Amino acid sequence: MRDGIIGAGNWILDKVKTIDRWPGEGNLCNILAEEQAGGGGPCNVLFDLAAMDPALPLYAAGRIGADADGDFLLAEIRRRGIDDRFMARSAAAPTGYTDVMSGEGRRTFFHCRGANAELAPEELERIGFPARFFYLGYLLLLDRLDAPEPRFGTGAARVLAAMRRNGCETVVDFVSEAPEKFAKTVCPALPQIDILIINELEAACCLGKPVRKTDGSLDETRLRPAAECLMAGGVKSLVVLHYPEGAAALDKQGNFLTVPSCELERARIVGTNGAGDAFAAGVIYALYRNRPLREALELGSVSSYYNLLSPTASGGAVDFARMEEKRRSCFGG
């Protein structure tokens, strides 16, 4: 029986500055607090999963620099009991990092890709480990995986195909980018993805039109067409869309459902860094435990709820018992 989850892709040190306001260009704001923590898709997802279930077999895969920032990330990985056998260190590039400006419930990122830009398809293809899930994130931020590849279209598609041949279910996230980059880089990977978990802005790249109205409100009528577009592009099993108001999912049988978010007063939101990854972690854990799809979306929402109570990407993560209690209070059942 396959067991465990591999998290591969961007490993980043988030250097979070909590600011008192958002200044206009040329103006000044005050930094109220500073904190550093692991970031990037696989880091956030695995750290959240480790908090939910410390006994869950987790494996980190990616590239970091041979520097103090890399030492910090490795220490954080090991502290959580995550296996680091698939982590490589670069002598030429620094550990990827992001200066995160967080305030008033918003965030802005200044990113250095560093060693993540060196992560090559063959490094991940060599992982022959029989895990149940292989998570890869973020497409469009991994230079060599985003590069063209003659057989599969991109390096990422090649890696995902290899993981599926090995018997893993593939789970993918990507970042918001221009539609032309989506078509060139993400579309070739869709047929190699079992489960796609993205936000509404990223889904709009496939649909070719916004899923929000001009006043900023969500156009719910476009959620299903966006999910259907991604499924038609080749996603094998499940498309999950998340957005501040809630989440939606479309499975391969054509079943479509939505759930609202857990309500949280705006004044209690400390930061939104990693909220989407927290949602993904909740969904992945629920699917790993064979929970119904509706409960998976609800647990994703609960995971995001706790994420919003911390300035860092995984600092708000809690154990599954607490998540389940919150899920029942928010959604019933």
Task: Give, region by region, the residue ranges found by the protein language model.
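Ribokinase/PfkB-type carbohydrate-kinase core domain
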Residues: 1-13, 71-89, 93, 100-258, ...
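Conserved post-catalytic alpha-helical subdomain immediately downstream of the catalytic base
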Residues: 233, 262-331
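Short glycine/serine/threonine-rich phosphate/pyrophosphate-binding segments
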Residues: 41-45, 95, 280
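Short, charged helix-to-loop "capping" segments that act as catalytic/coupling loops
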Residues: 38, 42-61, 140-151, 234-237, ...
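Short, charged, surface-exposed secondary-structure boundary motifs
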Residues: 39, 119-120, 206-208, 266-273
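Glycine-rich phosphate/adenosyl-contacting loop at the front of the ribokinase-like
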Residues: 1-79, 268-272, 333
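Short, conserved phosphate/pyrophosphate- and ester-handling motifs at nucleotide-, phospho-/glycolipid
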Residues: 49, 199, 276
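Alpha-helix C-terminal capping segments
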Residues: 47-55, 101-102, 286-289
